[in-house]
Amino acid sequence: MKTTRLVLLILGLGISPLVSSADEKAKPAADEEGFVSMFDGKTLKGWEEMPATDKKAWSVKDGIIVGEGGEGRGYLVYEKRDIADFEMKFSYRFPKAPANSGVNIRASKDKTGKRKFQAYHVDIGHVGIGKKVLGAWDFHTPGRKEHSCFRGDRLVIDKDDKPTVTKIEGAITAEEINKGGWNEVHVIVKGNRFKFSINGKPASEFTEHLPESKRLDKGMIQLQLHDPGMIVEYKNLRIKIDRPVGAVPLNF
């Protein structure tokens, strides 16, 4: 009987830490809580090509979304079409340079015909790694000023659409980009405030104080193919949607 009790005690001591360890592994990291995957790693389920073409520009290879540029600009659009406030994380790389891509947010059809879509654009293009491309916010906003918010800029747009730019301390530099390798991006969009980082360092950000009627309040998330012949790869795409539309949280 004593031997049996001793064996049970030893087994109990051995199992307890294993269960505890498993529980710990099951818990998401604090900075990943609330995020869900946007990509199943095998198919493009939940995504749609725009415009639709006979020659598919987007595919999945070895758990990676691969985009190959054809005639005109192409987009891969996430299934949820009216997203306003959210955080998005992903990794990207360009197997060959130069190449240009980015992510449109709050995108919708451009009724003026200037572009296919109006949107705020997270620019991650490696076209000489210039300040006007990589790490910038682009404004694809017909009918109003299309401001410059380059890598390292903090832009504030007042109610009259006048810009003020200051510099972000510790912003990512061209030398800190993995040319030809994977780079991690984190986009945060809340109300009228927008920012993103690359490899854990701030890239650029802006705040708009325009009337709501002049701002883009919600829309699609689109991965972009900018040029013919280019290749871009995406993986580990995940998103946390906070609200369809909402006010800016304090202390953001």
What do these predicted regions represent?
Residues 7-17:
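Bacterial N-terminal signal peptides
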Residues 1-6:
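Positively charged n-region of N-terminal signal peptides that target proteins for export
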